């Protein structure tokens, strides 16, 4: 169950849409978003964690994200997700299974943090950012509260390094007691990825079971 919880987290970073926003917060998010809008390609090292308050269980896994325009490859020890601009491939090595789908644009925005951090026009309320110092770094914490009561989370927060406006952490606080955290450990922008790096090669997995739901 733990691995499926993390897969759900990978697939549901949650679209950042909020209204009646604080101008100071918008200015911070603009600067963070521009890092990726202006980049030829971005690579991130991530730590993905789930904390279940009801059971006390904690699960985490490290991952690597490569993204350019609308394409991305998100790799962890238990699954690889690859979106080539049209199709999404999810490979799970423990069961040797590949799932192929053609998700809507809004669904893809939920999976790639660089897309998420640029979508902040409506749908959320956001107060003035909080400021603090962590490990010698001055940071801002921007919190978002969904206006739609049907959302399965009640708060989302983004930590931003004020020295370079890079995101440090994205945390989603679920109504079910689940706290999902993405720690961004390292960011490299203006990467020049080859086409081969961003396209899923089915030939590499000749014995994998393929589930095509396109």
Where are these regions (language model features)?
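Solvent-exposed strand-loop boundary residues in beta-sheet-rich modules
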Residues: 54, 94-96, 176
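An acidic-aromatic
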Residues: 62-111, 180-181
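Surface-exposed, polar helix/loop patches in the mature regions of secreted/periplasmic/lumenal proteins
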Residues: 87-145
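Beta-turn initiation residues at beta-strand->coil junctions
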Residues: 48, 76, 92-93, 171-174
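Sec-dependent N-terminal signal peptides
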Residues: 4-13
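N-terminal leader/targeting segments and the immediate start of mature chains
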Residues: 16-57, 68-71, 204-214
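Gly/Pro-enriched, hydrophobic low-complexity segments
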Residues: 127-206, 211-213
